[in-house]
Amino acid sequence: MGVPFVLMIHKFFPMANAFFTSLGFNVVLTDPTSEETIRLSQQLAQSETCYPVKLIYGHMQQLIDQKVDYIFLPTIHTMKHEKSRVKHNYGCVYMQTAAASIAKALDIESKGITLLSPVFDLDFGQEAMASAMLGLSKILGIPKPFCAKALLSGAMAVRRHTAAVEKQGKALLATLRPDDKVLVLITRNYGVSDPILNMGIPELLLERGYKVITLSHLPGHALDISDEYAISI
């Protein structure tokens, strides 16, 4: 089971890894973006997109070269924002189309590779996401009860990962002195953990003496600050 280390995989990999491993698959995650990934992406890209999406070409080609049987890359239709006042929070058009369009551009079917791209409507909650993942049972030829059990393993993996990340954040905050300066990096997960997309900013800040933490390390996701950032229409 090939998994390109791109976009929201930086968030969903703990779930996906536990899910597919529980079903007996060997999970192959591509290496972090490198100069080779960039070179492949520049050669293979067939349209102008944002840089994070363009890098999918290189990551997917690396999985093709490794001769995986499946490539897992979800389609993100809507996002979940706890305090949003709009009816639906849609992902950008590339998140909705990149998996299928790039798989087609690289013609993975002719190479014997099947794309698994469940549609995640995250603003409908965990049940909708679970339904999308269970829909893979037919493609994989695995009974739904087995997939449901694997999905529970995925959910537990997410809880453990989230707790571990927040524990790291609390440990850092506990070491702070009153005059310490801490910078919180607020971006998508891939904007922090991808070594190319983060442009070395975390390391640069550390070199300048700042303590750096990401939004995922902070347990304040339920805090409602919408009144401070509401847009008047």
What are the residue ranges of the model-derived segments?
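An N-terminal assembly and electron-transfer interface module characteristic of large anaerobic redox
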Residues: 1-233
